Amino acid sequence: MKSSIVAKLEALQERREEVEVLLGDPGVISDQIRFRALSKEYAQLSDVTRCFQHWWQVQEDIHTAEHLLQDPEMRDMAQEELLASGASLEQLEQQLQVLLLPRDPDDERGCFLEVRAGTGGDEAALFAGDLFRMYSRYAETRRWKVEIVSASYGEHGGFKEVIAKVSHEGAYGLLKFESGGHRVQRVPETESQGRIHTSACTVAVMPEIPEAELPEINAGDLRIDTFRSSGAGGQHVNTTDSAIRITHLPTGLVVECQDERSQHKNKAKALAVLGARLRAAEVQRRQQEESSTRRNLLGSGDRSDRIRTYNFPQGRVTDHRIGLTLYRLDEVIEGKLDMLIQPIMQEYQADQLAALSETP
C-alpha cells in the first residue's frame, strides 16, 4: 500500500483518539448537536481504524512467517501462512481504499424528487405517473415517508410535473443516481394499430438541505404569486388562494406548491425546494468543472442527458451509463430498483478508486 495512503490512515487513527476524548467532555455532552455529530464521526473513524489495525496485524504475521522460512522444520507452515496472509492483506487494502473514498456529506440526507413529463404528450404524463409510482413503491419497501409538495396533473392521468419530499436519512445517497432523462417505448392504450410510441421524462433528485445551509436568497429576486389550488382534471380543491408560485428572477426557476391549505406552509415548502434547486445547480457546476475529463455517473437532470430506457414490449430496461440491460421490467416498475441502483453505485465507487490510485 502506498505510503501516502498509510499516512492518511495514521492521521485518521489519531483523529479517532481525539474524538474519543471529546465525547467524554461534559461541555460536548451538554451540546447535543455537537455530540451527535462527533458520535457519527467516531463511528465512521472506528470502521477505518479497525480495518487498519487488522492490516498492521497481517503485516506482522507476514514478517513472522518470512522469518520462520529460515527454519527447515517450520518452512511448510510458514509458506502456508504467507499465502493466506498475502490474500488477506490484498483484501484489507481494497477495503481500506474504499473506506478512504471521499464521502458526499449530502448522502445521509433526505431529498426532493422531481419528475417532469417531456416529449410525448399524454403518454409522457402517464409515464411520469408510472415513474413516480415506481419511486413511491421503492420508498415503501424501505419505510421512507414520501410527501407530495407540488403536482401538475395530466389531462388523462399521470403528471405533467410532480415534486415530492422523501424524508429518511440516506434517501439522497441512493436516489441521486436517478437524475437524468428516462425514455419509455410502449404501445399507448389509445393506439389502435399497435404502434410503439417513444416518450420521455426527466427526473431530478436534490438533497434536502437544513435551513441554515440553504443559499441566501434576496427577497428582491423573488416574484411571489398566489392562486387557487387545483387537483387532477383541473377541479379546484380549495376556495382560497392558498397555492404559491415563486419565481427566482435571476435564474428563471419557478416553484409551485399547493399541497397545504395554509398559504404560509406552501410558501415555506416552495422556498425549501427553490433553495435546494439553487444549491444543486451550484454543486453540479462545480462537479462539471472538477470532472471534465472523467465520466460522471451522476445524471445532470437535463432532458438531453438520457440515462435509462424502459422498453415494455420486450420487458427490457437498459441503463445507458454502465451498459446494463435487464429483462425484468415488471419488477423494476413495481419499485425493485436496487437491481439497477446497486450496480451503478459499484461502478461509481470503482471510478472513485481509479481516481484515488492516480493521486500521488
From Swiss-Prot:
Residues 284-293 have a biased composition (Basic and acidic residues). It holds the Pfam family PCRF. GO terms for cellular component: cytoplasm. PANTHER family: LD18447P. HAMAP family: Rel_fac_1. Belongs to the prokaryotic/mitochondrial release factor family. This is Peptide chain release factor 1. It comes from Sodalis glossinidius (strain morsitans). The gene is prfA.
